[in-house]
Amino acid sequence: MSKGTIHRGRTLGRLRVRRAVTDPEHPRQRSTKGERTRERIIDAAGELFSRSGYRAVSLRDIAAHAGLTHAGVLHHFPNKEATLIHVLSRRDAIDAPLVLDVGPNHGALIDNLVRIVERNTRTPGLVSLYVNLSAEATDPAHPAHDYFFARYRILREHLVPTFAVLLEGRPNPTPEVAAQQFIALQDGLQVQWLLEPGAIDMRAAVVSFLRTLGITTSDPLPPPDERPG
């Protein structure tokens, strides 16, 4: 698959794997011991990748963090890249429908993206994971390069027509620029929030940016004295 080809399935990136057993939309009656072990490995990989990045972590590190032997991890995953694919795909099972399933409801897409920002404030490990991996993945040789390339392409493809409708009649910014600004704002806020979480209100900053464009959300900002932090 070429870099310009984007999956249209239930993922925001290029990676496809079987559905994780923790997908809340499709719960199972029970999980086998092997599935529970796989989830433990994915948890361990996600924690280590978020803390140290992908390249600084070995499969043996993941095994030790999961309380398993190296051979035990290899029984479930052939290599470190396979664990990365599952770590990224697990979250996409939750986030992708919020972006891909809204259809022509442009207001719903904006509301859902604001909800994702809000939810990210409760998952610092995940935010750290994406910040570290997206920076590393600018290298075309990185195993997550195509994933993040496609993720940004898909977000822009959905945001540009949304801003075209919501900004109708405004000469500036163009829908393309507004989409780029929105994504850049989210990414930059995440870095600042990781450095100084108590001083950064990511959701408030995103909603405020949208207001400067004349766009309101279904859940507006509370008065300043009622905001957290």
For each feature predicted by the language model, list its residue ranges.
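Hydrophobic alpha-helical bundle segments that form small-molecule/ligand-binding pockets
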Residues: 141, 153-178, 185, 214-229
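Amphipathic alpha-helical segments used for helix-helix packing
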Residues: 122-149
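Helix-turn-helix
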Residues: 37-40, 44-82, 86
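Short, basic, alpha-helical segments at the C-terminal edge of helix-turn-helix-like DNA-binding modules
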Residues: 89-95
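N-terminal intrinsically disordered/low-complexity leader segments
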Residues: 1-36, 219-229
